[in-house]
Amino acid sequence: MNKRNLLLFGFVLIIFSSVLISSCGEDKVTAKSTQPASLSYHEEFDSMQRVIDMGWKGVNLSDPIGSQSWQQGSYVVNGLNGTKGGPFESRIASHSYKASASEHAYVNYFAGEGLSFLNCWLITPELSMKNGDIISFWTTTADPVSFPDRMQVWLNPTSNSYNVGRTSAETGDFTVKLLDINPNLSPTAYPVGYPSTWTKFEIVISGLPNGTIPQKHRVGFRYYVKDGGPGGTVSDEIGLDDFDFISQ
């Protein structure tokens, strides 16, 4: 190969290499250009360990406290023996599930011991929340109703803390009560009592000091029953499923 051809070949090789490097660089930049993740969030409670890893937290402040807290559902077909005491076999099958009818969050009267004031919380991960956003969830007690149940929904409007106080009379940083299901512990059918079939509840968020600017907050589900527990005349079991936070 003469010198002229050699120089021409080298020039072409340099141009080709420059184009190839430029192309690879452009591909790399394109791969990093992704849309921001949605602020909305859906939880199916198919695995409580995964849920805990996601930032959910159970806090049991029942008095006296029992051996259980919020946990994975434990549905057993025709399971309950009809009286209070153990072992506990749940009559609640999940609202929706892929592999098991126990794919929901669940709590029962063993959150307390003896005659107990049940005060057992399940708190969401941080949610980037603003006024006008929506939370929804499905809940039920067992059918038929043997012992009435109650659940409250609270909002922490000022921070992202898990602080729910230390006693049944306190709610800590969760100062906004969004919902109280069956506050009078009625044994009758919903809407007076607690729903005994899966029922959807939807809440529009309002009153946040940050207005329409998303900030980190948490929502707390509170199993809250006076004179409950294994020795009580009220409290049985409730399920929570298909939680949605919808950013508007």
Task: Explain the meaning of each model-derived region.
Residues 44-104:
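Extracellular glycan-recognition surfaces and repeat-rich motifs
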Residues 1-22:
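Sec-dependent bacterial lipoprotein signal peptides
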Residues 17-48, 247:
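Bacterial Sec-dependent N-terminal signal peptides
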Residues 176-248:
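Terminal, low-complexity interaction segments
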Residues 133-185:
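Extracellular ligand-binding interfaces
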Residues 114-134, 198-203, 240:
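Short beta-strands within extracellular/lumenal beta-sheet-rich domains
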Residues 45, 122-143, 151-155, 214-228, ...:
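Extracellular beta-strand-rich recognition modules
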Residues 68-88, 170-196:
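Surface-exposed intrinsically disordered loops and tails
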